[in-house]
């Protein structure tokens, strides 16, 4: 009888301790900032179809229902690294973002800007992205530049293999820089190079990625985003 009584006391004490040890989990509000150009705003697709919006929605599905996600874009069709730098500097941004994505450079190539300009300004943009991401390199993801040569637009305007070679040059520089500085770099260029054999990957303007293509971008981005935000 005495043994049963002691066991009961121990059980009650254990339950009491474990209950006290449980911490209340409060809902969290996460913020995402996406920097870039037409590939970021999703030219020719719906407002919820571009990759930042799809990434946000995918994160919502991965996290507790009480958590919330907000998304801010600083991007515009035609922007070069110079345009994006000026825009970021002109905004009153806080350095509190949980995740910052950066995709920039295609208009430097398309507008025949000196490659040295990208070599100079891309690192500045990465540093700014890190600063905005709470100063933490682990909160930043750089996305490779899509290849518009593999679209009807690219073919109709007679773009040669040199276009893809130049885009490779930009992406190789960005990838090497990110690898050397501990920044996550996600390659999605190969997805866009299927645009001629899978026309569903190209939007109605015959140039930019479609909603489907952006969903494939997100499949690659999501594991990194989840890891960084958790």
What are these regions (language model features)?
Residues 13-16:
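C-terminal motif of bacterial Sec signal peptides marking the signal peptidase cleavage site
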Residues 41, 47, 80-83, 110, ...:
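Basic, gly/Ser/Thr/Pro-rich low-complexity segments located predominantly at protein N termini
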Residues 2-8:
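Sec-dependent signal peptide recognition
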Residues 76-80, 163:
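Short, flexible loop segments at the rims of nucleotide/cofactor-binding pockets, characterized by
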Residues 86-230:
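Alpha-helical cap/lid subdomain in secreted, periplasmic
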């Amino acid at each position: 009888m005495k043994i049963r009584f002691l066991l009961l006391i121990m059980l009650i004490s254990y339950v009491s301790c474990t209950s006290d040890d449980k911490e209340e989990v409060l809902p969290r509000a996460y913020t995402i900032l996406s920097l870039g150009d037409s590939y970021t705003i999703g030219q020719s697709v719906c407002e919820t179809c571009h990759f930042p919006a799809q990434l946000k929605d995918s994160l919502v599905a991965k996290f507790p229902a009480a958590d919330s996600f907000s998304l801010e874009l600083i991007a515009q069709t035609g922007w070069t690294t110079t345009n994006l730098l000026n825009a970021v500097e002109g905004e009153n941004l806080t350095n509190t973002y949980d995740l910052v994505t950066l995709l920039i450079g295609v208009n430097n190539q398309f507008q025949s800007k000196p490659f040295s300009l990208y070599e100079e300004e891309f690192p500045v943009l990465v540093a700014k992205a890190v600063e905005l991401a709470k100063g933490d390199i682990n909160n930043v993801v750089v996305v490779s530049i899509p290849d518009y040569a593999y679209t009807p637009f690219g073919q109709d305007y007679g773009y040669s293999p040199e276009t893809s070679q130049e885009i490779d040059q930009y992406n190789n520089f960005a990838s090497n820089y990110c690898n050397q500085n501990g920044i996550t770099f996600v390659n999605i260029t190969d997805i866009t190079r299927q645009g001629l054999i899978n026309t569903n990957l190209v939007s109605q303007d015959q140039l930019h990625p479609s909603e489907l293509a952006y969903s494939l971008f997100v499949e690659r981005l999501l594991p990194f985003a989840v890891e960084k935000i958790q």
